[in-house]
Amino acid sequence: LEYETKFNNRKNYPDIFAQFKYVIENMKNPLNGLYYHAIDVSREAFWCDKVTGLSQQCWLRASGWFAMALLDTLDKIDNSDHKYDAECKMLEDAFVDLINSMLKYQDESGMWYQVVNYGGMKNNYLETSGSSIMAYSLLKGVRLGYLPESYREYAEKAIDDQIDKLNELKDKYSEIINLIGTSWDDYNKKLKYSAEIADMTFTEME
């Protein structure tokens, strides 16, 4: 969209908005306001529902990326002539709704789980990068005026908890926890990444 704004006279704005509209209308779970991770319009992928084409999971990072995309698009769009008022309203409503839905699943620690709506599931875990994405979306949403100032505390809580989880191990190691597989289907093995000053070592934990 930024390219379209600066160099292409907004010619492909309609296509950009159409893609957002498709996701909003087809990938949102109406029961909890979360978005499914993926959709296969052919209904042929092994992971998809054969009726809807949707995956089964609401994945934290995917939800965060979508929140960022909505917000960053709103930030960069040129709507000075009000030609795209309806589209901007669509994106704003989707962003605010997604944030409010995600806040229902924020853990008391301040972070979110990898599979957002299964916080109590065995081997699900509080995920660092996705929680950072959500903190970014919350803070930028507040700064741009799409979210109330009170939402800042949710972002700060997520950031504070991640800082607390960066632990110094003795005097040689730094441990970054909660860096394991990108899918909850791969939880049979977990990786603990121990970063030594001289080099990186990987210790596999059963």
Regions inferred by a protein language model and the residue ranges of each:
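Surface-exposed helix-capping loop/turn segments at secondary-structure junctions
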Residues: 29-33, 76-85, 106-112, 144-149, ...
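Short, solvent-exposed positions on alpha-helices
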Residues: 10-14, 85-89, 93, 149, ...
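Extracellular glycan-targeting catalytic surfaces
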Residues: 13, 17-20, 64, 71, ...
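Solvent-exposed loop and edge beta-strand segments that line ligand/cofactor-binding
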Residues: 47-68, 85-87, 91, 106, ...
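Active-site cleft segment of glycoside hydrolase catalytic domains centered on the general acid/base Glu
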Residues: 4-11, 20, 49-53
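CBM-like carbohydrate-recognition segments
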Residues: 123-126, 130, 135-136, 140-206
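Long, well-ordered core segments of solenoidal/helical folds
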Residues: 14-36, 41-46, 92-110, 154-172
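Well-ordered alpha-helical scaffold segments within catalytic/enzyme domains
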Residues: 1-9, 65-87, 132-147, 206
